[in-house]
């Protein structure tokens, strides 16, 4: 197996040497000033009752925003639904929602972020028929949601829920116990938002008579605080509830609010099996609410139906897994309240059709490949539309299949990464395509024939610009790990690569459960930085090791209870194989990563000191004891149950093995991976009298951005590698 691995790399090395012209070189500033940013369709939404889609447009010269509707068939603009030119009270639009009857628009302005997904905005409701603009509240509110007929808007403000009546313009407060760091109604707490990936924890039923919501009791959740330094004499302190692994989580409960009666009822749930409520969604039956619940270990998921008239629950579906179960938004109810569901219970993520009583009607898709996105169901021809990796785990294609599992058809035709936005009648879709060699483009496609109707947008100008930079190429391959698994990988070599010379190598990875870095899509900012390094004489290699995604549940869940063990082993093994290549300077191999990738790069340098010379860790987890409960326990259970799993693979445990060059970077306002992680590791390294470098960014969060911050950060990392690798 090792011989095959080396031959493969050697094959890459012997590729013809391209003639190098005197062209521009990438600079760090160029990466972050928008030079390489591709054009894209902003805020594209499919309308519900018309064969149209809407787009948020901005006229920079006039400084006006418009919400425009386009015909799916002709791609011609049909009308401007809303323009700030006619409504000067709205200076800018940050987001918008069109209701299900396409006659009202919720418009957000004065955007103010809270955490990763949450924000407050001032919202207006625009009636397309009357052209009347109504301010929902004078306050900056969260997550307003129109009911189906657009007569009422539910929203959250300062941890309480409200209902605004559009006709009377009166507001009813439906909860009163909301309090910061104590009780939240209808909005998720920090850990739900981060790890279950949603903010709005309420939903209207089909006829707008009932509002279901989740209440979060944070009283027993430990407090975390961060100093915000700013420029004042004394720093401010940001205090919020953050449950670390093994600590108390919010106690969640479910409620139903009857609009006509102005009354609320609690829905009784089992506290053990409903430890988490990661999703609520009304079915097509206005009297039936669906609720997904998880136990604390997240290895048993129940789908419940709640009768809103009686408040009684019934368990419709139960899934169990030896490791964990991922929560998705793919649940779709059909007219008869049977439902479409995705699951990896058979080893790969696939689509299933269940009857309304929870009995399996049919497994719709199957095979040793994964469904990666679900687009919708067309009841007219009983067809499901989805995205999958059937053509290889690094690629994405769009497919259709009948509800009974027949007549599967690939709708996308160009290799790479394809995603789709379908017209309301599913007769057309906008295909967003990119690949390692082709910048993003948007094309209108006829669904039935797969025929391309018209190109909507391309990035030919960007590709022309990039020709001036004579970029190296990403070469995709597979590498073997020590047990013979195929690992997806890419290698970037200098454009003037000479197989008779030796080059330093920088490895890049993220490695987190279910993640993917090696994929056939267009470049991101890290790619351009890697190209910059290649222009300076470095080879960059990335390999997705065990635990990463889209290759089946067994490969992804192998790391259960031992995060860092197999992932680190794979990166070290790949580095050792690279060191044997004649074109690699075996004494100059480094590795870097961010977040989970920083956890990995730290561990790789400490545990692989015989092969790694240098590592950069940005915002790393250094002990899973410091990270949040939902994410960590999903893969590790609790530290009380699995102390060795937490400690044996912690960089802090292996800090004494540090021999090479180590640059540790963190932002002090990181609400996700707290700077505590780096501080504890720093303290350990100092205690061990280890030489290392570190860089702290005051008041910067997990993304470490704002102003010139990213430019300064990547300049620092570039110079560090030039000096230390």
Predicted features and spans:
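Serine-hydrolase catalytic core recognition
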Residues: 223, 286, 419-725
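N-terminal signal peptide c-region/cleavage motif recognized by signal peptidases
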Residues: 15-17
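Beta-propeller folds
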Residues: 6-7, 13, 22-419, 427-428, ...
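Glycine-centered structural positions embedded in regular secondary structure
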Residues: 11, 185-186, 489, 590
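Positively charged n-region of N-terminal signal peptides that target proteins for export
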Residues: 1-5
